[in-house]
Amino acid sequence: MFTPVIVIRGGREAALMDLDDVARLAEALTGVRRAAQEGLAEWRYHGRLVARQLDDVYLVIRADFDFRDSMLRQFPGTFSVPTRYIKHMMVVADLAGGDTGAIEDALEAAWQLQRSAD
C-alpha cells in the first residue's frame, strides 16, 4: 500500500498516483523487475509484461478480458481500451485522474495473471 498525494479537484479531494508510486507497488510484487525500453519504464514478471509506461500519465496494464471488462464497467474514468489494444489482454490506466485503489488492484491482478503461467 502507498500513501497517495491528495489534491482538490472540483471541490473534492482526489488521490494522485505517479510512476514512482507504480514502481514502488510493482517492484514490491515477488519476481517483478523494472526495465526501460526507449526511455519508458516497464515491469515484468519472469520476462512477462505486468505493466508498461505509455507516457507520464498513462500506464498499460496486462489484464485478462473478463477482468478488463469488469474494470472498465466499474471504473470508466480510470481505465480505457484504445482501438490498438482491443484484441490484446491490456487496459490503459489514467494515473493522474484515476482511482488509485483500482489501479493498485489491476497491477496485482496483472502480476497474478503472469504468475499463473508458471
Q: Residues of each region from the PLM?
A:
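Charge-dense, helix-prone N-terminal extensions
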Residues: 1-118
